[in-house]
């Protein structure tokens, strides 16, 4: 998913891109934001896209910096949220070493570290780490590898037990194409590789960048977000992303 991919989504983002904020069943992400928020603190939204989290961040913090590497997406956010006077906007590629120096009290990053290239992910994590002051907090939302595998199990299990014909079988909302790098957490969704993370992988990775993980929770979604024709009888646990609250300790 390069910059050109996201630039083209500026006018169709709401209809084509999954809305984490809207689909968070238990509002766990907002709860995590509330835990670290203060009208005396500064916050950044790294990978803000069209700014869906800005109306939540703006009233809770002293100032907000909205950051994205797609200028068209950033412009859409700025146009939509002109009334949020404590929000500024910055066009930065977070997969390149940042020249800018920041010391935020908190950073929110929602499903932005998706690249299948390890080197680019490493730079992104390093940019996060150096932009948060000591004892500041990172709220990170990230795709769960456990959930991706669990969803495939549920699809297979449901189809087997019900002996469905090919036309009746339940299917994923996105085509799983090349999964030859599944052992690395790379899941190809509609031919686009997305990095997914194990819970323990997240804790270890964040630790290597000077963070101490304080909590890891599930951001639960309905089955309809993952399965196109999900039976109403499909039980919990539901598919999820991970949300991590981590403190910068080094």
PLM region spans:
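A short SAM/SAH-binding and catalytic strip from SAM-dependent methyltransferases
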Residues: 106-120
